[in-house]
Each structure stands twice: as structure tokens, then as C-alpha cells.
Amino acid sequence: MVGTAIASFFGMLAISTIYGLAHTFIAKSLSEKISQAWAHRSARFMILVIIAIQGISAFILYGSSLYLLYQGATFTPYTSDYGTLYDGSEDITVAWIVFGLSMAVSVVADIIKVILVLTFAD
């Protein structure tokens, strides 16, 4: 399971990198509107609150995902009394689910931020 956990880690890293590059491209194309929206105090406050929520939740969920990958990689396989083999793949699957939830929170937060920027831009 160590190989699967390492491959999953690099897969998660690649997905995060691709999302970060797309985010950078969108931010550059909206830079003028972001500057206009930043002039409004209420927009600035709402955007900062969303950024804080996004950062805290992403940190917790991504950290949980990495911990689950670690658990799956270091799991000692065993067979139950009913013949089912437990090998740690459940932890790796749950890690992917938690990572997907983390990415979903980031996407929703970024969509809300874009809506706020476009609403408050002059």
C-alpha cells in the first residue's frame, strides 16, 4: 500500500497544482475588476472572510487527507475471521474523498469570490 499512497499523494499534488495554475490565470484576467472591488470596504471584508474560511477548511481537510494516506501506507494487513482482507486501501479511498471535499470547498469559495468581485466592480 505504500506505493499506492505515494502515487495518490502525487496525484493529489498534481490536481492541486493544475487548480492553482487555473486560479492564477483567472485572477490575472480579472485583476482590474479585483482592484475596483477592493476599493469597497464591504466587499473587502466579505472576500477576506471567505478567504479565511477557505484557508482554514482547506488546511484541515488537506492535512486530514495526508494523515489518512499515511495511515493507509503504514497499515498492517490482516484477514478477519470471515475471510475479508483488510489492507489499508479503505484509508486511501477515504483520503481521496476528503481531498475531493477540500477541492470542492475551494472551488465554491472561489466562485463566490468571483461573484463578489464582479458585483462590486465599478
Task: For each feature predicted by the language model, list its residue ranges.
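Transmembrane alpha-helical segments in integral membrane proteins
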Residues: 19-26, 102-121
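Interfacial non-cytosolic loop connecting adjacent transmembrane helices
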Residues: 2, 34, 65-97
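N-terminal signal-anchor/start-transfer transmembrane helix
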Residues: 8-31
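Amphipathic, cytosolic membrane-interfacial segments at TM-TM junctions
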Residues: 28-48
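Membrane-helix interface and helix-disruption motif detector
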Residues: 1-7
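Hydrophobic alpha-helical membrane-insertion segments
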Residues: 49-66
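Alpha-helical transmembrane spans of integral membrane proteins, capturing the lipid-embedded, hydrophobic core
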Residues: 9, 13-17, 55, 99, ...
